[in-house]
């Protein structure tokens, strides 16, 4: 069965769906989540764990290239900066896999290649790494 996100064709609507999926999962894991008013800020959500706040930009992808999924970690102004966000939460829609990527590891990258089926892939340690939001 196809995951529901694959049926959403409009990119903005798909992004909103991914944000709701992120918020739902974070709440299930006992985080407090806040959603900023408006869409002009650099992050989509604020995750609170015992008073520690993390600014999270939610991204999603279903673009497969070779064995990996390509996910944008930038916006129309370029790569995100540690001044703007703390994490990119990337959802691979077909596999329903989350990556919690600290902004510090992304450098000036525009895209990341995520390979959930490979345990030794470049970003494997960030696959389902929700614990990073607890630090």
Show where each model-derived region lies.
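Mixed-charge (Asp/Glu-Lys/Arg
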Residues: 1-41, 46-135
């Amino acid at each position: 069965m196809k995951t529901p996100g694959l049926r959403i064709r409009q990119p903005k609507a798909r992004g909103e769906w991914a944000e709701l999926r992120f918020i739902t999962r974070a709440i299930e894991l006992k985080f407090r989540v806040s959603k900023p008013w408006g869409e002009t800020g650099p992050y989509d959500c604020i995750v609170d764990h015992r008073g520690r706040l993390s600014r999270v930009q939610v991204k999603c992808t279903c673009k497969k290239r070779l064995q990996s999924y390509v996910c944008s970690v930038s916006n129309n102004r370029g790569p995100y900066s540690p001044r703007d966000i703390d994490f990119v939460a990337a959802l691979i829609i077909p596999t329903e896999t989350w990556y919690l990527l600290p902004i510090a590891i992304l450098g000036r990258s525009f895209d990341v290649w995520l390979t959930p089926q490979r345990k030794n892939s470049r970003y494997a340690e960030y696959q389902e790494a929700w614990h990073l939001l607890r630090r």
